[in-house]
């Protein structure tokens, strides 16, 4: 009985000491005291040592975390210093290599006009695919990288339409063009057409032209006032005599 009271007093002293230091008292201790789960000194020692071990482990973990973070910060600062030194000092440039003429993977956009040119109220999924295309440069500008072997490939995409506020999924087939082989070929430039000054005249002479001639017909009117005084004379004989006189 005296031993139990001694354990109880020692535990109360420990709790007061802990509360005096300012650390919060765990709720498990109050529960263990109320339940009388501490039956011996070994239980109390085990409990105290368990708390101390946990505290030691927590402190150890905190120290290791601090040291680890410090090591990371130090290594990061060293890396930054090395990068700064490399940026400030002249670096050795590697020799440039020509991008040779060969097939490369490119992204091809699947447009809606490849599926339906009469309707634009739909979506295509996927919106883009990968194709093989020739690319690269040649030794001079007179030759270009062009495909020498081409293969057509059929792929199936989804055509998404909205009908009565609901999506309708349909299947559509798209033809893709893949380049299998490439080669630098000579570019044949279109020759400019030169025209001489006489060529336009010859062209005009060869071209039949329709000429429209407009003639003006003048209508002669009798002079006014002539024979005006004889317009009421009906006798031709008298008229001749008068004119002959």
Curated annotation (Swiss-Prot):
Keywords: Cleavage on pair of basic residues, Developmental protein, Disulfide bond, Glycoprotein, Growth factor, Mitogen, Proto-oncogene, Secreted, Signal. Disulfide bonds join 101-145, 134-182, 138-184. Pfam families: PDGF, PDGF_N. InterPro entries: Cystine-knot_cytokine, PD_growth_factor_CS, PDGF/VEGF_dom, PDGF_N. Residues 1-20 form the signal peptide. Residues 220-245 are annotated as: Disordered. GO terms for molecular function: growth factor activity; platelet-derived growth factor receptor binding; protein homodimerization activity; superoxide-generating NADPH oxidase activator activity. Transmembrane segments: none annotated. One of its GO terms (biological process) is protein phosphorylation. Residues 236-245 have a biased composition (Basic and acidic residues). GO terms for cellular component: basolateral plasma membrane; cell surface; cytoplasm; extracellular space. Residues 220-235 have a biased composition (Basic residues). Glycans are attached at residue 63. It is found in: Secreted. Residues 21-81, 195-245 form a propeptide. It comes from the Eukaryota. PROSITE patterns: PDGF_1, PDGF_2. Growth factor that plays an essential role in the regulation of embryonic development, cell proliferation, cell migration, survival and chemotaxis. Potent mitogen for cells of mesenchymal origin. Required for normal proliferation and recruitment of pericytes and vascular smooth muscle cells in the central nervous system, skin, lung, heart and placenta. Required for normal blood vessel development, and for normal development of kidney glomeruli. Plays an important role in wound healing. Signaling is modulated by the formation of heterodimers with PDGFA. Antiparallel homodimer; disulfide-linked. Antiparallel heterodimer with PDGFA; disulfide-linked. The PDGFB homodimer interacts with PDGFRA and PDGFRB homodimers, and with heterodimers formed by PDGFRA and PDGFRB. The heterodimer composed of PDGFA and PDGFB interacts with PDGFRB homodimers, and with heterodimers formed by PDGFRA and PDGFRB. Interacts with XLKD1. Interacts with LRP1. Interacts with SORL1 (via the N-terminal ectodomain). Interacts with CD82; this interaction inhibits PDGFB-mediated signaling pathway. Belongs to the PDGF/VEGF growth factor family. This is Platelet-derived growth factor subunit B. The lineage of its organism: Eukaryota, Metazoa, Chordata, Craniata, Vertebrata. The gene is PDGFB.
